[in-house]
Curated annotation (Swiss-Prot):
Induction remark: Up-regulated by the nitrogen regulatory protein C (NtrC also called GlnG) and repressed by RutR.
Entry EC number(s): 1.14.99.46
Statement: the UniProt record of this protein carries the keyword Hydrolase: no
One function term, GO molecular function aspect: uracil oxygenase activity
Keywords attached to this entry: Flavoprotein, FMN, Monooxygenase, NADP, Oxidoreductase
Protein name (record): Pyrimidine monooxygenase RutA
Enzyme class: oxidoreductase
SUPFAM superfamilies xrefs: Bacterial luciferase-like
Binding positions (FMN): I49, K50, N115, E124, R140, Y141, S190
Pfam families documented for this protein: Bac_luciferase
UniProt superkingdom: Bacteria
Catalytic reaction(s) noted: uracil + FMNH2 + NADH + O2 = (Z)-3-ureidoacrylate + FMN + NAD(+) + H2O + H(+); thymine + FMNH2 + NADH + O2 = (Z)-2-methylureidoacrylate + FMN + NAD(+) + H2O + H(+)
Similarity comment: family membership: Belongs to the NtaA/SnaA/DszA monooxygenase family. RutA subfamily.
Source organism of this protein record: Escherichia coli (strain ATCC 33849 / DSM 4235 / NCIMB 12045 / K12 / DH1)
Amino acid sequence: MKIGVFVPIGNNGWLISTHAPQYMPTFELNKAIVQKAEHYHFDFALSMIKLRGFGGKTEFWDHNLESFTLMAGLAAVTSRIQIYATAATLTLPPAIVARMAATIDSISGGRFGVNLVTGWQKPEYEQMGIWPGDDYFSRRYDYLTEYVQVLRDLWGTGKSDFKGDFFTMNDCRVSPQPSVPMKVICAGQSDAGMAFSARYADFNFCFGKGVNTPTAFAPTAARMKQAAEQTGRDVGSYVLFMVIADETDDAARAKWEHYKAGADEEALSWLTEQSQKDTRSGTDTNVRQMADPTSAVNINMGTLVGSYASVARMLDEVASVPGAEGVLLTFDDFLSGIETFGERIQPLMQCRAHLPALTQEVA
């Protein structure tokens, strides 16, 4: 099973709590995180894109770096780990994304890929005057389908004459082309999102579910497998989890309860409000899960809370789910969390037993 790190491009990572570590996103922090992840044989690093935060006492995600420029910098200071940036497709023409991706392919020596997102938080785009109207909620995957076709044309042949409802290319050129086939990833949980991934993505991200219920996402992975079978493609699921680990189950649980007790209710209210804006995409979208009150303090990603042995066992359970090809991990404290994962958790995981021995620790 592949392991990736979801780097904290926004302030405070993924804990919406006054009791969680409070920090700003910087290149130096993310450089240290990704170099440490590479040292511990993580397979990939992904950054999101967020253009407006949730506010509240913690100013959650009010402070964000930009994904492509951050990952270009990280590509230059790593050598093995795969690097993925996220394109907010309403903000960037596909021909520009194609050229930026080809540039980072050159920087990284063929280790780069692109995560495509349609955009769900209306204020991110209204503030710039580029929100296309609420009809977009129901047409966003039509838009993304045209977008990715332009990308594939330009990466594959260096030229596009695509004509569609959203994009018109007239002998559009991009050169040099990527040195290896460019991977495209998506994070669709709705039927429309999974249908898109089944046709165009190399793999699909989905949320884990619940606390210490590592296989609860299995129905989502099964839906993705079924969608991919209909297109004749192999599109695996990569599952998002937060790891909160300590020497004992009780110690880890105490940390989790402490974070929940400090939940930033004002920021969470903003998330809930935004999740209700899309009345056209159904009830199975990512943002609906993010705003579920069950575990909103970490946007309802699956949460693994326990001793190092308990977390290792639960991750092996994740690997046993049909269609689950990888996990994307976040941590309450990224630097210490990755080190603890590499030293204390990963060596206990049967699904990672193939890894070579560690070299000297990264500085």
